Amino acid sequence: AGSKVVGYFTEWGTYDRKYYVKNIEXS
């Protein structure tokens, strides 16, 4: 379960960064 959580957070963090940058470019 531990490694599964780490993989989830890593994947979500990458997506969140892309979305954040996209948001800045749009404004």
From Swiss-Prot:
- Specify the superkingdom: Bacteria
Task: Tell me where in this chain the GH18 domain is found.
Answer: 3-27
Could you tell me which InterPro entries the record lists for this protein?
A: Glyco_hydro18_cat
Q: Which UniProt keywords apply?
A: Carbohydrate metabolism, Chitin degradation, Glycosidase, Hydrolase, Polysaccharide degradation
GO biological process annotation, one example: chitin catabolic process
Any one Gene Ontology MF annotation carried by this entry is:
endochitinase activity
Q: What is its EC number?
A: 3.2.1.14
* Catalytic activity of the protein: Random endo-hydrolysis of N-acetyl-beta-D-glucosaminide (1->4)-beta-linkages in chitin and chitodextrins
Main EC class of this protein?
A: hydrolase
Instruction: State the family named in the UniProt similarity comment for this chain.
Output: Belongs to the glycosyl hydrolase 18 family. Chitinase class II subfamily.
Question: What is its quaternary makeup?
Answer: Homodimer.
The UniProt function text for this chain reads: Able to cleave chitin oligomers from N=3 to 6.
**What name has this protein been given in UniProt?**
Chitinase 47 kDa
